[in-house]
Every structure is written in structure tokens, then in C-alpha cells.
Amino acid sequence: SGEMSAKNNDPLYWYTTTEEETLFAWYPSSETLLTEWTVASDQTIEESYKNSDFLYAYEKMKFRSERKLKFHHGTVKLIINVKGDGDTVSEEDLKDIVFTVSAVTKGSMAEGKLQSAAGVEATVMKPYLLENAREGYAYSFQLLMIPQDMSGKLFFKVALKDGRNFGHTPGNGEGILEGGHQYTYNVGVGKPGLKVTIEKDSVSWDGDDEEVEGTDRE
């Protein structure tokens, strides 16, 4: 959590006390209006992972409103914990595992919401490997994504060094990923395939939100 300050000192005026204004702000800042956002397909380096996120605020306010902008994460955060079943896939089998995610990496802003860009095909994404895996798991990964619906689409893929490959396709309505939310997937690799469970589906990812206050000007 840190401080944000506007670079432009030009104030925002309300012409009447009943007029409603739409305020849209984002960080990192840019000289032009934020209309689209792209996450890195290869997030194996921590810098690429962190640079895939942005904060934004979209509020409708009147002059007498409490003028606070609450910044939210624009992307989806995935935490993926992986282990073998201990029978058909051992911890040794998981060494040098290749875990990938298929998803659209380009999004567009509409009415203050980020959504996957139309007509863009899914890209193979590589997540960031955490130094310490969750207890009971061999590996833990993190990935930042554009909000989208992965229902009925190949989502995860696991490739083992012995040539075995596994995939996971969420069922109808099970792959909806909302911006500003964190999804923890616990993945078991083995027979007959991937056993995937979601831990506390759609938990709000608001731990780093910022509030910026305005001043009274008419």
C-alpha cells in the first residue's frame, strides 16, 4: 500500500450542485485514456508478473457526494497449487513439470470494467513459480489474467517429463473469472486426469486498494 498523487494540477469543477460526473482514474498513469490492457503471456519472471496488473477507479459522483476514489485491481489473480496423486504420479514425476494456462491476454475497458477483447484467440500463458509451495503440494504458481469466461474451454495443461499430458476444461458456468478477484485452484495430477478444486471461489482481491480523496470545488 502506498500513496498516489495527481500530476496535473487542473481542478475538476462541478457546474451545478446536482450535476453528476463520471470519474475514471488508473495506475500506472498514461497520457492517453486507458482503453485496453494486455497481460504478459510469459509471467515466469517476477517483473513481468507484477507489470501485468493495474489499479483503477470508476465512480459516478455529485458535488455533495463523498468524493473518494477506491482503486481496484483490474486483472484476475490465480493461485495454482499442484501435487501428484502419490500413485500414478509421484513427486519425482512432477520434477521439471510444465504448467500452462490458455487464455486471452488482451482486454478492453468498457463502462469502467476490463473484459477480454473481442475476436482475440487464446494464448498459452506461463505462470510465476513461487519459491515456497503451499504445504502438502509440490508447486505453487501465480498468474494475472484478463477477466473472461473459461467455461467449456481448455484452461490448464500439465506436461510431465515422461511425456504424459493432462488438461482441464471447466464445466458450464465454472470458468467465470471476474476482475479484482482471486481464485485459488488446487490441482491433483494422476489417474484418470487432473482433479481440480476451487478454494473459496471468487474471493475479493482487495488487500491493496487505495482511496484518494477529492476537495470541494464548484
Predicted regions and their residues:
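Edge beta-strands of extracellular beta-sandwich domains
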Residues: 35-39, 165-173
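Intrinsically disordered, low-complexity repeat and linker tracts
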Residues: 184-218
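Surface-exposed loop/edge segments in extracytoplasmic proteins
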Residues: 1, 90, 106-112, 163-170
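Short helix-loop boundary/capping segments
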Residues: 62, 70-73, 77-145, 150-153
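Short, low-hydrophobicity acidic/polar segments
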Residues: 1-93, 137-140, 145, 178, ...
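Exposed beta-strand face motif in extracellular beta-rich ectodomains
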Residues: 19-23, 150-156
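Short, surface-exposed linear segments at secondary-structure transitions and domain or protein termini
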Residues: 3-7, 123-124, 174-187
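Conserved structural position at the C-terminal beta-strand
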Residues: 27, 158-160
